[in-house]
Structure formats: C-alpha cells, structure tokens
Amino acid sequence: VICDVAAPIEVDEELTFDGPAPRRNAATLTALACADRVIALGEADVIGLPRLINLAREVQSRPDLFAPETDVQYWLNRSRREAAGFTPEAKMRDNWARYMQVPLTGVIPYERKVMDRLRRNGEALLEVASRHAVVQSLEAMLEGMYAVRPGA
C-alpha cells in the first residue's frame, strides 16, 4: 500500500481537551507508524532542501514515529541548474551531507523544457526517452521501494 502524506508530522500533544479529541495529523501518524518503508521527498531548491533536512532531524529525534525496522529514504525532486548551479545533484548532496549523517538516497532531475514538451504533445517520458536521467532516477526509487530487505 502506498500512502501519500504531507508534512508536518508533529504530534498535537500540546493541545489539551476535556476528553479525547481528533488530532490534526492522526491519519498521517498512523500511516507512518504502520509503514515498513517511508520515502520522504523534498524539493531540490533553497526552500525544499532545508525543509527536508528539518524533517529528517525530526524523524531522528522521534524514534516512536516508526517501527525500528522501518526503512526511511530521503529523496530530492526537481533538481535543476537554475536553482542549484551547474552540477545540481552534486551541490544538493554536498549540502545534505554538511547537515545530515543519514544518506540522501537520491536526487531526481528536472528539465522544464522537456517536461513542457511532453505535456504539450501528450507524450510519456518513458516512451520517448526511456534512458533519460529522470526515468533512471524514478526507476532507482521504485527499485528501492520494492526491494526485499534481509529478514523481511
């Protein structure tokens, strides 16, 4: 089962009620607690990278968020030269490593002109350019999602 949830993942413990009350993020927290694999996806730019780093720090500080055997992967999406310079993937990985000890699993590139052309022509990237860097990155993500873990 794949469940798409959005940040934030904080627990509303600071809210007090006279009785049980619904929590704003109850569905998100329940889905994460039941997950055997989590892919955290952030935007590869000056806003998205710090947000993903903050999320990763929150995950590290909250061992109760997932089962101990949960595989958590961190990916950056829409990596592009306009946002990060000539070698965007290398820069994103360097910036990630500067602040985080856990590995950045992958970076998905983005080429707006190519994507715009595909949408305009009603084409799928996999059909038109099956070896494109975006396709290879998404294949790597999917392989990681469905990889069998030792002992599972």
Residue ranges of model-derived segments:
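Switch II (G3) loop of P-loop NTPases
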Residues: 1-27
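Beta-strand-loop-alpha "switch" segments that mediate conformational coupling across diverse proteins
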Residues: 78-81, 93-124
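An anion/phosphate-binding loop that grips the pyrophosphate of nucleotide cofactors and donors
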Residues: 35
